[in-house]
Amino acid sequence: AESSAMKFQRQHVDSEGSSSSNANYCNEMMVRRKMTQDRCKPVNTFVHEPLADVQAVCFQKNVPCKNGQTNCYQSYSSMHITDCRVTSNSKFPDCSYRTTQAQKSIVVACEGNLYVPVHFDASVEPST
């Protein structure tokens, strides 16, 4: 079975990619990364930074998670991300997404012996 850490990488890490010149980025990636198989996942964020940099966030600023848990961490620096949001006229299995890129600080939940990201909690303006 796919581990939580591997699922996080599949759903949220695209180190080599960028949506900068591709309005279809989300439509392509949401299918390629298997997030449209049983439904159209409504919202998803891809992080375009090296995996090691994303994993390092687990040792950065400890912040509360949206669900109240305490194992979330915010990156000190902003990261190049792409937000994918399902469009209102999207009908499964023809999932259609709006692609928005940003530079933001990311918040991830971490767990396990290696203490790696297992959940993408939010993207926020970097705190000064």
From Swiss-Prot:
Gene3D superfamilies in UniProt: Ribonuclease A-like domain
Gene Ontology biological-process annotations: defense response to Gram-positive bacterium
Keyword Disulfide bond: yes
GO function terms (MF aspect): lyase activity; nucleic acid binding; ribonuclease A activity
Region (Disordered) residue spans: 1-23
Active site: 12 (proton acceptor), 119 (proton donor)
Tissue expression pattern: Pancreas.
Compartment(s) of residence: Secreted
EC number: 4.6.1.18
Residues engaged in binding substrate: 7, 10, 41-45, 66, 85
Disulfide bridges in this chain: 26-84, 40-95, 58-110, 65-72
Pfam families in the cross-refs: RnaseA (PF00074)
InterPro entries attached to this UniProt entry: RNaseA (IPR001427), RNaseA-like_dom_sf (IPR036816), RNaseA_AS (IPR023411), RNaseA_domain (IPR023412)
Keywords: Disulfide bond, Endonuclease, Hydrolase, Lyase, Nuclease, Secreted
GO CC field: extracellular region
Top-level taxon of origin: Eukaryota
Catalytic activity line of the entry: an [RNA] containing cytidine + H2O = an [RNA]-3'-cytidine-3'-phosphate + a 5'-hydroxy-ribonucleotide-3'-[RNA]; an [RNA] containing uridine + H2O = an [RNA]-3'-uridine-3'-phosphate + a 5'-hydroxy-ribonucleotide-3'-[RNA]
Record's subunit section: Monomer. Interacts with and forms tight 1:1 complexes with RNH1. Dimerization of two such complexes may occur. Interaction with RNH1 inhibits this protein.
Physiological role: Endonuclease that catalyzes the cleavage of RNA on the 3' side of pyrimidine nucleotides. Acts on single-stranded and double-stranded RNA.
Family recorded in the similarity comment: Belongs to the pancreatic ribonuclease family.
Designated name of the protein: Ribonuclease pancreatic
Species per Swiss-Prot/TrEMBL record: Hydrochoerus hydrochaeris
Gene: RNASE1
